[in-house]
Structures are given as structure tokens and as C-alpha cells.
């Protein structure tokens, strides 16, 4: 197959660690390894749109309307991964999809997607939770939705590295949904070692983080690291925590688990679907005590691994996930 990948414009600001971009790149490389052609669309380029078997768009936004509406007139084989990360009550979310007026060009991204339903052949969700928002929020037919789980990147796991008793976080520290203030508060209250890795923002944002940390010597802001350094941290950490207020999947948590970390993760949204039946700590992200006590339990847990690692490798390796993706793409031509 010949496939076009169109990434949401804001990804250009986010760097290599952007989850949506990472998801698309993992899929693209595996598709290419399996013999398919994947063009990563550049707005400055020129393309023969009719030549594509699939045009796959990533990321919900107002830009979708013109991109998909015009594009589907040239090539009808549009697939859309909206990436819906929300805890908004379903009734409220559904109401927002009706808020607009096409004749007056009054659009929200939710309204625009409802109008685009006829132009999209297939919607992809990463979890049943996300699929429910597509079906119940936008009124998309169940047979137009495929659930394709995300796969983890190939991170070097070194079993010879001795686990150290600290908790690791990886992500954009300045995003409110990542819930860093409560994670820091939990570390201060329960005195576990915490290492924060990722985008710490500008100097003003970093100063706010350091003000939250105060004189706590058990909390370290590391900031950006390269892939090799990240792999080392994954291999060293006993626990990985992602107590987000909302999260689609949390690829970094999957990566950490593959490297032998015990996992503490939000009980909201779709991430918990990836760990069903496994020994992970699900936490209420609004409860500092729940976060702190769960991390302490995970630091003491010596039985969750390596079973967790083995199960995730079996279920979410890139080859298996991309085979499901290919099956979904082929539905467009049946």
C-alpha cells in the first residue's frame, strides 16, 4: 500500500517527544519495514493525492475541516486518528459537537468533526474509552471505528542494571494535565526520591516548579535527556508514575514498564485498559495521598515484574499492533 501521513500542525513545536508524532512515526517505520510506502506529508511538498491507498490524518483541530473536506474530494480513502484525551462528561462533550453554524463559518473543532463524518471512511481509537467518545459524542457508527492499540518504542532493556529506589516521571512538566504539582506534593509529603524528566518550560516555568519543590532534597528536575540517557533512567528506576488528570495512553509508561519499572498510573481515561489484570497501581490523580501511598507500595513491590513486562511485549509489540492497523486500512477497499 501507499499511505500518506498528515500530522497536526502544532506537532512542529513539540519536538520528538510528542506522543502523537511518536505514535505515527512508530507505525510508519514498521509499515515501511513490512514493505509499504509511507509519505510524511510536508505542506511545502507536492503530492499525487489520487495515488494513495490511504490518507491518514493525526490530531483533532479546526484545521481538520478544510484539510479533510477538500482532500476527500480528491481521494475518498481518509482515515482519522483524532487523539481524544478528555474527562469531560459525555453529555457536555456531545453538546459541544453541535455548537456551530456552517453557513456562518462558526466552527469549534468538535462541531467541525461532526460535520466531517461523511468525509472520513474510518476512525481509529487507541482505547475503548476513546472509541466511546467517538460513538456516543459524535454519533459515529460503530462499524466506522477500529481500536488500534499503541505500541511501545524499542527501548534497550538491560536486566543487569540494578533497580534503584526512586520514582521517575517523563513528560512535559508545564502541562497542567500532567499533574506535576500534586506529584511533587506527594513526594514532599511521603519522602520518596522523585526524578522529573522532560520539558520543564522556560525559566519562569522552571522557577515555579522549584518553588513547589522548595527545600525538598529528594526531588530532582533533570529536564531534557537524549534517548540513550532516557533508556538508562528507565532501567534504573524502580517505579514510573504518570498520575495525569487526563491521558490518552501514556506511551512513556509502556516504555518504562518494558524496562522493568513498576507502574503507578491515573485511574481516569483509557490508560488503565493497557494494564488490565496486571499488578499496577491505579490512582485518583486528584488525591495527593492516594498518589503518594501508591508510589510507596510500588517501591516495595518485588512481584509485579517481570510478568508485567512480558505481558506488554506480547500484547503491544509494534509488529502485532501494525498488523491490526494494516487490517483496518484494508477495510477501506473491501
What kind of region is each of these model predictions?
Residues 19-22, 300-331:
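A charged, aromatic-enriched C-terminal amphipathic alpha-helix characteristic of glycosyltransferases
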Residues 102-123, 132:
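Membrane-proximal helix-turn-helix segments that form the acceptor-binding/catalytic region
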Residues 160-178, 184-191, 195:
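Conserved donor-binding/catalytic core segment of Leloir-type glycosyltransferases
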Residues 262-265:
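Short hydrophobic beta-strand element within catalytic cores of glycosyltransferases
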Residues 277-288, 296-302:
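Conserved acidic donor-binding segment of nucleotide-sugar-dependent glycosyltransferases
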